[in-house]
Amino acid sequence: MEESWDFEFLSRMVDSLVSFLSEFVDDWLANDMRVAVFKILFSWLVVSLVAIHFAWKVYGNTVNDMYYRQGTGGQNGGTPDTHLSGWESAAGDAMKTHRE
């Protein structure tokens, strides 16, 4: 009983996909305004992704090295991490440390 339901569901999904694709192809061949806008936006997306890919190939190591820079400074080579909030630094109190 369950097999017929699964087959029916799968058949409906395939029919829906085929009808969507046939309608899409008909619109594509009609070359109306919606298709022109879709082509422009899709080509912009593809060109942007290709540009990002090539930029990452060229500058990826530099960006990675800048992020994981080793040095005497803070976590990423910047200022040291002090973890002082505005209240502690304004009061001028020294940071309390745990002593055993």
From Swiss-Prot:
GO annotations of cellular component type: membrane
Gene Ontology BP annotations: osteoclast fusion
Predominant cellular place of this UniProt entry's protein: membrane
Subcellular localization(s) per the UniProt record: Membrane
InterPro entries xrefs: TCTA
Location of region: Disordered: 76-100
Keywords per UniProt: Membrane, Transmembrane, Transmembrane helix
Membrane spanning residue stretches: 35-55
Record's bilayer topology term: Single-pass membrane protein
Family: Belongs to the TCTA family.
Protein name in UniProt: T-cell leukemia translocation-altered gene protein homolog
Native source species: Danio rerio
